[in-house]
Every structure is written in C-alpha cells, then in structure tokens.
Amino acid sequence: MRVIHDYGLVRVVSLGDPFNLTYDIEVQCQRDGEWHLYQGFDSLSDDYAYTNAREAAGHAIRERAAEIAGASRC
C-alpha cells in the first residue's frame, strides 16, 4: 500500500496490483483510530481514477468537517 495523498483524517491510497483487486485506488476516512473505505476506484477501467479519487477525497473532507463541527456544537 502506498499513500498518494494524506489530508489528515482523509487519505488516498494505492493498494497495488489492479488485476487482483476490485479497487486499487481507495479514498479512506479515519474514524476511531481506524481507516475505513469511503470510495474505491479501479484504475484499469477508469482512466480518471486518480482525479476522481482526489475529488472524492474533497467530498470526504467536507463530510468529516461537518461531522466534527456538528459534534462540537452539541
């Protein structure tokens, strides 16, 4: 596994061999100290997998920020 982009609580990772994995590019979010799949991409069938992963990471960052902001208001 190789971390492509690390945004703190959100990261984009390359898991390696696209021939043996459903998703070889993953956007992951950290919750309770563990990384969870947010959205996956297959670089063999998606020519824009890395671009789409960066866009999905932006959505994940906004969602996590809203969750954290909502939790701190209560």
Name every feature range the model reports, one short phrase each.
Residues 1-30:
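Short N-terminal "domain-start" leader segments
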Residues 32-74:
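Mixed-charge, Lys/Arg-enriched low-complexity segments
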